[in-house]
Amino acid sequence: MATMTYTTLTQDLKDWMENDGTEFSNETDNFISLAEQRISRDIDPYAFHESATSSFNTSDRFVSKPSDAKIIFHFIWLDSDSKRIFLEERTDEYIYDYWPTSSSTGNPKYWANYSDTALLVAPTPNSSYTIEISYARRLAELSSSNTTNWLTQNAQDLLLYACLME
């Protein structure tokens, strides 16, 4: 089977739908995007699992999320002896209630999703410990400039079928 690309997928959609019209062609990017989003929600292949390493900023209760993170699995920090300490996930309300004064510091115990770009920890870190975040990454979206991704290389039939369903 030949490798699927953005170009071959858009042509396959036109062929399967027997529609070469401008209106249909203008919507193919939308069909592809919706199909990728659906697949990304419905499956969680190991190939999408990533790990990122960073460090706490002393006296800052916020940590930047990896830019491609969809779901956080684990949040770990390494103490001075390189012992891995897993933080427990909580809600941001819990963290604000547990550690209301952000200027007070300590060894972090909890984390919460704060926004699309940040995580919240408590207690506020008292040192710039190394951190590891395990997560499911977002799928790289297909486009005319990004012509292949995991789906075109590993699940061509699934991607085509999902696009046709849209």
Feature roles, as predicted:
Residues 1-166:
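Glycine-enriched, solvent-exposed interface loops adjoining structured elements
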